[in-house]
Amino acid sequence: MEQGLRSDGNNPPSIDKTRVLDVKPLRCLAPVFPSPNGMSSVSTPQPSPFVCVPPTGPFPPGVAPFYPFVAPNDSGRPGESSQQTPSGVPNQGGPFGFAQPISPVPLNSFRTPTTANGNSGRSRRAVDDDDYSNSQDQNDQFASGFSVHVNNVEDSGTGKKRGRPKKPRRAQQAEGLTPVEVDVEPLLTQLLTSFKLVDLDQVKKADGDKELAGRVLLVFDLFRRRMTQIDESRDGPGSGRRPDLKASNMLMTKGVRTNQTKRIGNAPGIEVGDIFFFRMELCLVGLHAPTMAGIDYMSVKLTMDEEPLAVSIVSSGGYDDDGGDGDVLIYTGQGGVQRKDGQVFDQKLERGNLALEKSVHRANEVRVIRGVKDVAYPTGKIYIYDGLYKIQESWAEKNKVGCNVFKYKLLRVPGQPEAFKVWKSIQQWKDGVASRVGVILPDLTSGAESQPVCLVNDVDDEKGPAYFTYIPSLKYSKPFVMPRPSPSCHCVGGCQPGDSNCACIQSNGGFLPYSSLGVLLSYKTLIHECGSACSCPPNCRNRMSQGGPKARLEVFKTKNRGWGLRSWDPIRGGGFICEYAGEVIDAGNYSDDNYIFDATRIYAPLEAERDYNDESRKVPFPLVISAKNGGNISRFMNHSCSPNVYWQLVVRQSNNEATYHIAFFAIRHIPPMQELTFDYGMDKADHRRKKCLCGSLNCRGYFY
C-alpha cells in the first residue's frame, strides 16, 4: 500500500521493528488529511475542506482521475492504459473537455470476467430435486424450503434473465370481461375461524392427528379452489397463477400446518392409501417436508456423532425408478440429472443419498409416496401414500448416459393396508388383463350412462338389489313456474370465466361455479346451471351435472350396510360424482323413507365460505325425491356421520320454468375403492330414527 502511494516504488521502505504501534479498530480511526501550511502535522485531524472538482479537471495536487473520468493518453504517461478501465471498454480518444464529452459506460461493464468454461453455477432446476408436478402449471420452482422463486432467474448459459413467461392479460374491455376484485385475506380468516385453525398451539403444530390433518387439508383445498375461481375471473382460464402455491404460502405464514416435527414412521393422522394432488399438501401435514426434493431426512445421534437417516421419499418418475409389483421399489438416488447446459455428472454420496445409505445399515422405516400421472390432467400427478418400507440393499451402476447413480431396493413392511397395489389392480381391470372378482353385472345402467357401472358382490351369495328401473336424471311431473322469465346466455362456444355478458355467470354472482376439470370451486346455497334455452353446447363448463358421472363407479355389497357405491378412479376434492335421480314427490307424502332424499331435513354446513348475500339462498320449495322404484347409482350411497360427499342444490332455468336438482360433490380427495357416503340429515320431527353403522369417530349412533 505504501509503495502504491510513493512516487518511487523501486526501493522498499525500511521498517523500524523497535517501534510499538498502537493498533485500533477501524471504526475508531478518523481520516487524516495533509496539514495546511503553518499547522502542525500532529494536531487533531480536521475535516477535509470541500473541494468541487469537475469530472474533466483540473485536479488538485495528489488527486488522480479515475475511469471513466480518466485523462487521455497524452496526459503525461503516453502508451499506458488506465488500470481502472474495465477490460473490453476502450478509453475515449481526443482532447478531454466538456466540448467533447465521453460516452457513458453501463455499470454492467464492471462485472467480474467469466471463466473460460462459463458459469457453472446451479441451473434453474436443482440437480438434486425429484421432479415436481402439480395440476396447475409447471413454471414456478420451489427450493427444498418454503421460499418461492418465480421471477428473474439467471440463466447460467446465456446470461439472460429467464423466469416465468408473462402472459398478456386478455383485453377485458374488448371481450366484455369485467375483473372481479376479491380480498382473499378475509376469506382465509373466515375459513380458519370456521375450522378452528386460528392460533394453533405448538403441540398441535408439532404432532397432529387425523381430525387436525383433515381440517388443514380441507381448508387448503377450499381456499385454493376459491382463489382459482377468482384468478380465472380476473385473468381468464390458464392464467398460470398457481393458486396452490399462494394458498399454501398464506397458510404456512399463519402457522396453519401440523406434524412439523420430523419423525421416523407414519405421520400422525395420515392413513396408508391417502392421496394428494399437490406437493404442498404433503408439506402441510408433515408427510414429506421438501417441496421438490425426493428425499427427506433428519439427523439422529445414535453414537458419539450424528448421522443422517432417511424418513420419506417421493418416487414420481423423475429418475429411472422401478415400481416393482407394489411391494418392491427400486429407487434411484438424487443428483446427476442432465442440466440445461448439457452437462452430466456422477451422483455423490451426500445429503439424501447418504441418508438412504445410512438407513440401509440402521434398517429404519421410510415413508414412501408414489406419484402417478393424473389421467384427467396429463401434466399433473397424484401422490399416493404407500406406507412404510425398509431399504434392503444399495448399489451403484451406470445410467443411460454413462454416469454413476445410486440404487436402493426398498421392501414394503408387511401387515399394512394395500395402497399402490389397488391402483395396479384397477388398471389391469380397465385394460382387460385381469377380471374383477365377484362381478354380477358388467353394467348396471344398461348403457344409460357414458361410463359402465358394474355390480359386484364378493361378500356373500346375494345376486343383486331389489328390482328398480334405472333412470339417469330427475323426473318432474311439472316444472316449477318462475314469476318472471329467466335470462339465458348466448355463449355459443361455452361460458367462460369473467364474461360479464353471460347471464348465467351473472346469476352465479359473477363467477363460474366449476373449473375446467369439473371441480366445484366454491359452495353456494344454489348453483345456476345453463338451461335448455341457453346457446352454449352440451359440454359447457356450466352444465357439469348434466353429463352424468365422470368417474368409473361400481355398486358393491358391503359387510353390514347392504349395497354401497365407490369409484375405481381417484376423485378430487370438489369433483362432481353424480346427481340424485328419481321422481319428485310431495314433501311428507311418504311412509317408507328408504331411497328417499329430503332437502327439508337439517344438514350440517360444510364450511363458512357461503355467499349469504345471495338472494336465492333459500330453497323456493321443499324438494323431496324418491328413488325406490326408479333411480340411478346415487340410490346406493349410504349414510355416514363423517361423509366424504356433499350435496348441492342446482337449478336449470328455461324461459319462465325451472327444475331443481341435487348434485353430489367430493368434500375432499377420495382414493379409489373408498366408499362414497353422505349425511342423510336430521329429521325435524325426530321420527323414523335408525341405528347408524358408519363406524366413524364422530358417529351420532343413529340416522334418519
Swiss-Prot record:
<feature type="compositionally biased region" description="Polar residues">
    <location>
        <begin position="109"/>
        <end position="121"/>
    </location>
</feature>
<feature type="domain" description="SET">
    <location>
        <begin position="551"/>
        <end position="681"/>
    </location>
</feature>
<feature type="domain" description="Post-SET">
    <location>
        <begin position="688"/>
        <end position="704"/>
    </location>
</feature>
<dbReference type="InterPro" id="IPR001214">
    <property type="entry name" value="SET_dom"/>
</dbReference>
<dbReference type="Pfam" id="PF00856">
    <property type="entry name" value="SET"/>
</dbReference>
<dbReference type="InterPro" id="IPR025794">
    <property type="entry name" value="H3-K9-MeTrfase_plant"/>
</dbReference>
<feature type="compositionally biased region" description="Polar residues">
    <location>
        <begin position="80"/>
        <end position="90"/>
    </location>
</feature>
<comment type="subunit">
    <text>Interacts with LHP1.</text>
</comment>
<feature type="binding site">
    <location>
        <position position="495"/>
    </location>
    <ligand>
        <name>Zn(2+) 3</name>
    </ligand>
</feature>
<feature type="region of interest" description="Disordered">
    <location>
        <begin position="1"/>
        <end position="21"/>
    </location>
</feature>
<keyword id="KW-0862">Zinc</keyword>
<feature type="domain" description="YDG">
    <location>
        <begin position="265"/>
        <end position="412"/>
    </location>
</feature>
<feature type="binding site">
    <location>
        <position position="491"/>
    </location>
    <ligand>
        <name>Zn(2+) 1</name>
    </ligand>
</feature>
<protein>
    <recommendedName>
        <fullName>Histone-lysine N-methyltransferase, H3 lysine-9 specific SUVH1</fullName>
        <ecNumber>2.1.1.-</ecNumber>
        <ecNumber>2.1.1.368</ecNumber>
        <ecNumber>2.1.1.369</ecNumber>
    </recommendedName>
</protein>
<feature type="binding site">
    <location>
        <position position="694"/>
    </location>
    <ligand>
        <name>Zn(2+) 4</name>
    </ligand>
</feature>
<feature type="binding site">
    <location>
        <position position="692"/>
    </location>
    <ligand>
        <name>Zn(2+) 4</name>
    </ligand>
</feature>
<feature type="binding site">
    <location>
        <position position="495"/>
    </location>
    <ligand>
        <name>Zn(2+) 1</name>
    </ligand>
</feature>
<dbReference type="InterPro" id="IPR003616">
    <property type="entry name" value="Post-SET_dom"/>
</dbReference>
<feature type="binding site">
    <location>
        <position position="504"/>
    </location>
    <ligand>
        <name>Zn(2+) 2</name>
    </ligand>
</feature>
<feature type="domain" description="Pre-SET">
    <location>
        <begin position="487"/>
        <end position="548"/>
    </location>
</feature>
<feature type="binding site">
    <location>
        <position position="699"/>
    </location>
    <ligand>
        <name>Zn(2+) 4</name>
    </ligand>
</feature>
<dbReference type="Pfam" id="PF05033">
    <property type="entry name" value="Pre-SET"/>
</dbReference>
<feature type="binding site">
    <location>
        <position position="489"/>
    </location>
    <ligand>
        <name>Zn(2+) 1</name>
    </ligand>
</feature>
<keyword id="KW-0949">S-adenosyl-L-methionine</keyword>
<dbReference type="GO" id="GO:0005634">
    <property type="term" value="C:nucleus"/>
</dbReference>
<feature type="binding site">
    <location>
        <position position="502"/>
    </location>
    <ligand>
        <name>Zn(2+) 1</name>
    </ligand>
</feature>
<dbReference type="InterPro" id="IPR007728">
    <property type="entry name" value="Pre-SET_dom"/>
</dbReference>
<dbReference type="GO" id="GO:0008270">
    <property type="term" value="F:zinc ion binding"/>
</dbReference>
<dbReference type="InterPro" id="IPR051357">
    <property type="entry name" value="H3K9_HMTase_SUVAR3-9"/>
</dbReference>
<feature type="binding site">
    <location>
        <position position="540"/>
    </location>
    <ligand>
        <name>Zn(2+) 3</name>
    </ligand>
</feature>
<feature type="binding site">
    <location>
        <position position="489"/>
    </location>
    <ligand>
        <name>Zn(2+) 2</name>
    </ligand>
</feature>
<feature type="binding site">
    <location>
        <position position="530"/>
    </location>
    <ligand>
        <name>Zn(2+) 2</name>
    </ligand>
</feature>
<feature type="binding site">
    <location>
        <begin position="561"/>
        <end position="563"/>
    </location>
    <ligand>
        <name>S-adenosyl-L-methionine</name>
    </ligand>
</feature>
<feature type="binding site">
    <location>
        <position position="530"/>
    </location>
    <ligand>
        <name>Zn(2+) 3</name>
    </ligand>
</feature>
<dbReference type="GO" id="GO:0140942">
    <property type="term" value="F:histone H3K9 dimethyltransferase activity"/>
</dbReference>
<keyword id="KW-0489">Methyltransferase</keyword>
<dbReference type="GO" id="GO:0032259">
    <property type="term" value="P:methylation"/>
</dbReference>
<dbReference type="Pfam" id="PF02182">
    <property type="entry name" value="SAD_SRA"/>
</dbReference>
<keyword id="KW-0158">Chromosome</keyword>
<feature type="binding site">
    <location>
        <position position="595"/>
    </location>
    <ligand>
        <name>S-adenosyl-L-methionine</name>
    </ligand>
</feature>
<dbReference type="InterPro" id="IPR046341">
    <property type="entry name" value="SET_dom_sf"/>
</dbReference>
<feature type="binding site">
    <location>
        <begin position="638"/>
        <end position="639"/>
    </location>
    <ligand>
        <name>S-adenosyl-L-methionine</name>
    </ligand>
</feature>
